[in-house]
Amino acid sequence: MSKKKAEDKQPIIKDEAVEEPKSDSKVNALSAKIAELQQQLDDSQNDYLRAQAEIQNMQKRSQKEQSALAKYGAQRLAKEVVPVMDDLKRALQVQVDNDSGQQLKTGIEMVYKHLEKALNDNDIKEIDADGVAFDPELHQAVQTVPADDDHPADTVVQVLQSGYKLADRVLRPAMVVVAQ
């Protein structure tokens, strides 16, 4: 036989790593360290998730505030303008006998209409009250009268002062007389 074939027939000895038996204390220490690191990782992940949730909540809150500001931003101005509308309405109810008074009344009517349009353009609307069913959210009853055929119970008989709404928010309820 040739040398190569003889070498091929020799038993192959594998290099096996001989493991030293580890002591239980070393295994326990490593297991404890792994558990500690796993706990730290879990805590960090929980903190991260909480921070993400807080950021999302802050963004939602900010969007709500911006939406409310856009929707109700004119509220302060509207509350100050509404009494002016009342004064202009009262001025328009005055009877005039001469031309100069009529011209003045026409000018007041123009101002009233422009102001009313500006309020409507900003979603500030007069509350419909005359002849409608009494709604305590929209109307403030300042007087009651007996109900009759023309005015059934719980309906508005007369509007003493107009009420106004900004979008879905009541700025001032209408002061009304209600049939009982």
From Swiss-Prot:
Keyword ATP-binding: no
Annotated segments matching region Disordered: 1-25
CDD domains on file: GrpE
GO terms assigned for molecular function: adenyl-nucleotide exchange factor activity; protein homodimerization activity; protein-folding chaperone binding; unfolded protein binding
PROSITE patterns: GRPE
InterPro entries in UniProt: GrpE, GrpE_coiled_coil, GrpE_head
Keyword entries, A-Z: Chaperone, Cytoplasm, Stress response
Cellular component GO terms held in the UniProt record: cytoplasm
GO annotation, biological process: protein folding
Subcellular location: Cytoplasm
Pfam family, one: GrpE
Family membership: Belongs to the GrpE family.
Subunit structure: Homodimer.
Role played: Participates actively in the response to hyperosmotic and heat shock by preventing the aggregation of stress-denatured proteins, in association with DnaK and GrpE. It is the nucleotide exchange factor for DnaK and may function as a thermosensor. Unfolded proteins bind initially to DnaJ; upon interaction with the DnaJ-bound protein, DnaK hydrolyzes its bound ATP, resulting in the formation of a stable complex. GrpE releases ADP from DnaK; ATP binding to DnaK triggers the release of the substrate protein, thus completing the reaction cycle.
UniProt protein name: Protein GrpE
